[in-house]
Structure formats: C-alpha cells, structure tokens
Curated annotation (Swiss-Prot):
Protein name: GTPase Der
Binding site for GTP 1: 8-15, 55-59, 118-121
Function: GTPase that plays an essential role in the late steps of ribosome biogenesis.
SUPFAM superfamilies assigned to the protein according to its UniProt record, in alphabetical order: P-loop containing nucleoside triphosphate hydrolases
Residue stretches making up the EngA-type G domain: 2-166, 176-351
Record's keyword terms, sorted: GTP-binding, Nucleotide-binding, Repeat, Ribosome biogenesis
BP GO annotations: ribosome biogenesis
Start and end residues of each KH-like domain: 352-436
Assembly and interaction partners: Associates with the 50S ribosomal subunit.
Length: 439
C-alpha cells in the first residue's frame, strides 16, 4: 500500500490538511470494537485507491530544541516511508530559510514532492503564494485546508503521483501469501527465522515489490507459500515510540499483498492497542487471521494458565472470534511447527467454494430454525443464496426485502455458515440484495 506523508514547518496547517483529506471523503477504515485509530496516520480510500496518510509534527531544520529535534527526526522517518510527499508551506508567513532547507532535503530524497501553499483563503492571496516558486519548483498547489479551497486539484495530483499497484504474477494465484505482523521486540524476526528453518527454505529470498519488505518463497506439504517480512521496522537507532507508529504503516503495506495475516502478540506484555489496530485493519481488508502468542516460555504457568490466557485474548479480540490462537516460543521452537499446519488449514478454508445447492439447504434450515424479523411491518422472504467469491469467502442472499435485514440476523446467518462449512480464520462477506437487483 502506498504512503503519503505531510511534512513542513510547525504551524503551517499540516494537521488541518490531514483532517481535511480525511473529512472530504469518509472512506477511512472503520473502527472495530477495541480498536483505536492513531490520530497521526490513517488508511484512506479515494476513487477506489487506498493509501496510508501520515501527519508529522513539524520540521525545523536548524533547531537544537529537544522537542523540535524529535519532530525533525519524525519527519525524516516519514519521508523515508513515503511514496509521495506533501510539503506544506504558509502563504501568510511567506517563504522562510527553513522552507528552503526542507525543500533541499526533499529534493535529495528522490521522492515525488507536491508543494502545497496553505492558507490561500481567496484569490487575493494567490499573488503572495507565487513567491514559493523561488524554491525551484514548476508547480504549486494553492489551498485552504481550513475551508477546502483547492483540495480537488491537490487530491487529483496525489492520486496521479502514487505508484501503480503491484501486479502479482500468475504463480500468485496458486500460492498463499503470509504477512507476519507484530510490534517491535515482540519476537517477530526470531519467529520468522524459526518458521523458515522448520519448513526448509527451498528458494532464495527476493526483493519484494513493496519497499522495505522481503518476499521469501517456500514449500510446505507440497504447497507454495510466500512469507512477506516487514524488514523496514527493524531499524537500529530509532526511538521506540517512532517504531511503534511506523511499524503499523509497514504492517498495512505488507498485509495489502497478503492472504493470511499472523498477528504476533507478546505473551508477557499481553494484548496492546497496536495489536488490536493491525488486526482490525486485517479484518477490514478481508484477510484471514491467526493470533500467535509468542514468548510463551517466559510465562509462569499452572494447569489453567493457557485456558485463562485464551479467554483474555478472545475477549480483547472479540471482533475476531473465528481466528485460531496458537501459543509458541520462537526462542525454543515450542509449537512453532503448528503455525504452518494451522496456516494450511486456514488457506483451504479461505479458498473454499460451496455449491449453490448445498448453500441453499443451509439457508433453508437456518430460516426454519429462526425466521428473519419483519421489515417495515412486512414478512421478509429469502429466495436463494450464492457464493460470489473466495479470499475471503463471499456470499449474496436474494430476497423480497433483503436490503432491510438487521445486522443481528446477518450475524446469525454468518454463524450458520461457519457451523456448516467451518471457515476457520476467515472473515465472511455476506451481502443482501432485493430480487430485482440480481442483475
């Protein structure tokens, strides 16, 4: 997934622009129970194109102030991660030496940079904005982030500058792609190395199509898999708080190309908000999910510890009741071999296709057992169900007033599908259409 970073000096309106981009099209990933959205980054979809938007604190190149130096480091890290950079300047304050220095740094990055002159609230401010051509740029985007002026042109330029989505080769239709997602120091690298060692690597690692990730093809039980490793989150010399934030962004980029997501949890620390966040994004993107509790060897245990811990994880991830939970130790190798055995099962479920006749027998039995509620005082009748896709399993139910189905009944039918067919680790996409909408 592409990344767009907003950088610039403090108080030029970066956060206002960030909020404006989010607010102009409310297609941000929705929160799931227990999931909090970091206000400094968000996944956005514009005209069918998803990207991650980053807001930075501010960029003061020459400052020795500790806070401002930290903000500068944050901006530099955002530039490293970005595919497109929005460099925001202030039309009312005018061109400053700091603007010039930041522009030079951005040019050296080699990344596409859009120069955004903010606080141009009307035509009378356009003339003042022209002085920023002194930065040596061919085009300026004059906007008012506060009022929305000029945003359509800016967003069109952003979408045009984004790199084309990576195209998977024909082999990708037959292989299962795994993303191992975890916070820094959760033991993700050790787990990956242990998995590769256990499963006997049969192909050399190759550079992935997404920057800062490595694709490692391997074979398990005569089936092809590709492990997507977010190598970019393991940088030395970075402050932990920054790594926490940018590891989420790396996770989003990795899971965009994955089929199955392994969310790695630190058994000692327990479930964190970041664990919930990346799992929520995986669910929203329709990925299969496994919850892997690592460092289980470090937990003091008795006969009921695993059961109690499982209950805690289930409660935290209550929006993923279908996700298998595996307790492992990457250090000792304990139960690591069970991960791929479970992945193999989930991959089969993720690609499961159910004949229409079988589906409709399940639908009929479900309705007989529990009739759907009335819609606007009239009886709801279902005609048939059909499967429309896999990865994730997707279904459509046609009826006379199907679009009025209550979410509780949708959940009931989803549970009936799971009872009948399994779909372990897989989200189910279930839609309802009126019979006249079949075409």
């Amino acid at each position: 997934m592409s990344v767009v970073a907003i950088v610039g000096r403090p108080n030029v309106g970066k956060s206002t622009l960030f909020n404006r981009i989010l607010g102009t099209r409310r297609a941000i990933v929705e929160d799931y129970p227990g999931v909090t959205r970091d206000r400094n980054y968000a996944q956005v979809t514009r005209y069918g194109t998803p990207f991650v938007l980053i807001d930075t604190g501010g960029f003061e190149p020459a400052s020795q102030n500790r806070l401002l130096k930290q903000m500068r480091e944050q901006s530099e890290l955002a530039v490293e991660e970005a595919d497109v950079i929005l460099f925001v300047v202030d039309a009312k304050e005018g061109l400053t030496p700091s603007d010039d220095e930041v522009a030079g740094m951005l040019r050296r990055s080699g990344k596409p940079v859009l120069y955004v002159v903010n606080k141009v609230d009307g035509d009378s401010h356009e003339a003042a904005a022209s002085e920023f051509y002194a930065l040596g740029v061919d085009q300026l985007y004059t906007v008012s982030a506060e009022h929305g002026r000029g945003m359509d042109d800016l967003m069109a330029a952003v979408l045009a500058a984004l790199p084309a989505p990576a195209k998977l080769d024909a082999r990708s239709c037959e292989e299962t792609r795994l993303a191992v997602i975890g916070r820094p120091n959760v033991g993700k690298s050790s787990l990956i190395n242990r998995m590769i060692g256990v499963e006997r690597l049969v192909a050399n690692p190759t550079a992935g199509t997404t920057r800062d990730s490595i694709d490692t093809p391997f074979v398990y039980n005569k089936k092809s898999y590709v492990l997507i490793d977010t190598a970019g989150i393991r940088r030395k010399g970075r402050v932990q708080q920054k790594l926490e934030k940018y590891s989420v962004i790396q996770s989003l980029k990795a899971m965009e190309r994955a089929h199955v997501v392994l969310v790695v949890i630190d058994a000692e620390e327990g479930v964190t908000e970041q664990d919930l966040t990346v799992a929520g994004y995986a669910l929203e993107r329709g990925r299969a999910v496994l919850l892997v509790v690592n460092k289980w060897d470090l937990v003091t245990k008795d006969h009921g510890t695993m059961k109690q811990y499982t209950e805690k994880v289930r409660h935290a991830f209550k929006f993923l009741p279908f996700a298998p939970i595996i307790f492992v130790s990457a250090l000792s190798g304990q139960r690591v071999s069970k991960i791929m055995a479970e992945v193999e099962k989930v991959a089969i479920e993720f690609n499961r296709q159910v004949p229409t006749g079988v589906l409709n027998r399940v639908l009929e039995e479900a309705v007989l057992s529990h009739a759907p509620p009335m819609v606007q005082g009239k009886r709801l009748k279902f005609y048939y169900m059909t499967q429309t896709g896999v990865r994730p399993p997707s279904f459509v139910v046609f009826g006379n007033r199907a679009t009025g189905v209550h979410f509780s009944y949708e959940r009931y039918l989803s549970n009936k599908l799971r009872e009948a067919f399994g779909f372990s680790g897989c989200p189910i996409r279930l839609k309802f259409k009126d019979r006249n909408a079949r075409e």
